[in-house]
Amino acid sequence: MGETARILVIDDDENIRKVLATILEDEGYKVDLVDTAKKAIEKTKRNFYNIALIDVRLPDMEGIELLTKMKDTTPKMRKIIITGYPTLQNAIQAVNRGADAYIVKPFDMEKVLKTIEEQLKMQKAEEKYSQERVAEFIETRVKELSVEKEATHK
């Protein structure tokens, strides 16, 4: 994995938070836990997270609404919705508001780990693509400036 991935677990159920933390930390991830959307927003202002596991039902805000708030402030963070109340409507809303994956409770931890791994690979691929585009732009711009410089010195 190289650098340790950071995961933010946002769930109001303490048992779920503890189970996820134990398993994810055993897999080598750095994990932070919060029980409200407000605390999640505060954490993401101070720290970078590769992934957020977001419960649909939180005491202060719906997880879907939290997705919308996080979409602009944490665009590189992968967002995975976890819910014990799966409906087609909330699945569609989740995807439309920026969820990268959707997991139904009670969840199979193997599926959760596989989803996290897939999301991290996608995040890494997007980052590499972005870096390549920047390098391409810089290379093109340097060539253009060199041509302009030569033209002005003639």
Give the residues covered by each predicted segment.
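Active-site residues of response regulator receiver
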Residues: 55
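Short hydrophobic/Thr-rich beta-strand motif most characteristic of the beta2 strand and flanking loop
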Residues: 28-35, 43
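The feature encodes the CheY-like receiver
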Residues: 17, 59, 83
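Short amphipathic alpha-helix used as the core "switch/output" element in two-component signaling
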Residues: 42, 64-76
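Acidic catalytic/metal-coordinating carboxylates
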Residues: 5, 36, 62-65
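C-terminal output helix
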Residues: 107-117
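CheY-like receiver
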Residues: 123-154
